[in-house]
């Protein structure tokens, strides 16, 4: 009995330590995709993924590692620190880093791999007396991103460094407000360099990037009819040029507004989303070029505007079939001198047949068409398509089940007889490969 009593304080201390660790456990999340493949001319290509779909159309290795922890919890007040690092490469070698040589291979690998800090922020709850349920946050983060998975198309997303209040209960829905920085490169707006000298004695000075701040207001979770909800939002981009940039400023560098309404309808255990978006000034380019709001085209011509209609979803079709789809139509008007109207349309379908809980066959077909009409009446068209057949093994039968390993074959073609493949020698190509994808 004395021996048992002797060890009781130690056991109590160990138990307390373990309980403390459990209470403040590190949350580990992530995403990755990687594989190997070949095309009709060397390694694989990536062709208009947002427009024709991503299955069998990705030639990279990409990964995200997210670590977060609740570091304080007392009297209903919590503080959470979140972080994420990302890596992107072409997957061409065993060792891929920021160096210039791959191991002992003479192949130069400068820029072979990129590393980025994607998130680092603090999220606090219970601090606001008027809204204890809301989250007060600051730092760099992914912010309420809306995307279509089958095409990797983010259509509503202002992620970046900023601050905000998220999830204030207001009637049936919740209000969120954020201020996020999304600068535009000097090269896109007024040129990378400015000549402060003369033509005879030039003196080129490198221009700074244009500071752009975005104010974002959203009202989400508005209930409508059965299994239907609505989310609406407004973004306002403020152009904030420096004194040195004011002489370079022209009428084109204007503030802009982006409005979004998203209707979500539950269907047979799946869902369908219809999205309406309208943008002015720099957001006209968001509508035309598959943007998401995280970049602002401040160089757009004064008075430019655009709109976009999106329909997408994933719906079960019986016990063994599921179907994912995307339909997009976007327009940008008078975005630069000589531009009258830019139209884009795309459609992607991804039906899937489940053989059992771990084995599935997937088809993905996508088509797009772009039309750029000039003020002189001429038009320039571009269109293309992709067809992919894949056999996949995944951790479950769901459309969203991951990890997944897939073997695929794809055919890609330009529909305007433009030789955009195989080093500019062919209007089409094929590619075959194996890819793994996971999120957790």
Curated annotation (Swiss-Prot):
<comment type="subunit">
    <text>Homotrimer formed of three 18-stranded antiparallel beta-barrels, containing three independent channels.</text>
</comment>
<keyword id="KW-0762">Sugar transport</keyword>
<dbReference type="GO" id="GO:0042958">
    <property type="term" value="F:maltodextrin transmembrane transporter activity"/>
</dbReference>
<dbReference type="InterPro" id="IPR036998">
    <property type="entry name" value="Porin_LamB_sf"/>
</dbReference>
<keyword id="KW-0406">Ion transport</keyword>
<comment type="function">
    <text>Involved in the transport of maltose and maltodextrins.</text>
</comment>
<keyword id="KW-0472">Membrane</keyword>
<dbReference type="InterPro" id="IPR003192">
    <property type="entry name" value="Porin_LamB"/>
</dbReference>
<feature type="site" description="Greasy slide, important in sugar transport">
    <location>
        <position position="400"/>
    </location>
</feature>
<keyword id="KW-0998">Cell outer membrane</keyword>
<keyword id="KW-1134">Transmembrane beta strand</keyword>
<comment type="similarity">
    <text>Belongs to the porin LamB (TC 1.B.3) family.</text>
</comment>
<dbReference type="Pfam" id="PF02264">
    <property type="entry name" value="LamB"/>
</dbReference>
<dbReference type="InterPro" id="IPR050286">
    <property type="entry name" value="G_neg_Bact_CarbUptk_Porin"/>
</dbReference>
<keyword id="KW-0812">Transmembrane</keyword>
<feature type="site" description="Greasy slide, important in sugar transport">
    <location>
        <position position="439"/>
    </location>
</feature>
<keyword id="KW-0626">Porin</keyword>
<feature type="site" description="Important in sugar transport">
    <location>
        <position position="154"/>
    </location>
</feature>
<dbReference type="GO" id="GO:0009279">
    <property type="term" value="C:cell outer membrane"/>
</dbReference>
<feature type="site" description="Greasy slide, important in sugar transport">
    <location>
        <position position="271"/>
    </location>
</feature>
<feature type="site" description="Greasy slide, important in sugar transport">
    <location>
        <position position="62"/>
    </location>
</feature>
<feature type="site" description="Greasy slide, important in sugar transport">
    <location>
        <position position="31"/>
    </location>
</feature>
<feature type="signal peptide">
    <location>
        <begin position="1"/>
        <end position="25"/>
    </location>
</feature>
<keyword id="KW-0813">Transport</keyword>
<dbReference type="GO" id="GO:0046930">
    <property type="term" value="C:pore complex"/>
</dbReference>
<dbReference type="GO" id="GO:0006811">
    <property type="term" value="P:monoatomic ion transport"/>
</dbReference>
<dbReference type="GO" id="GO:0015481">
    <property type="term" value="F:maltose transporting porin activity"/>
</dbReference>
<keyword id="KW-0732">Signal</keyword>
<protein>
    <recommendedName>
        <fullName>Maltoporin</fullName>
    </recommendedName>
</protein>
<feature type="site" description="Greasy slide, important in sugar transport">
    <location>
        <position position="95"/>
    </location>
</feature>
<dbReference type="InterPro" id="IPR023738">
    <property type="entry name" value="Maltoporin"/>
</dbReference>
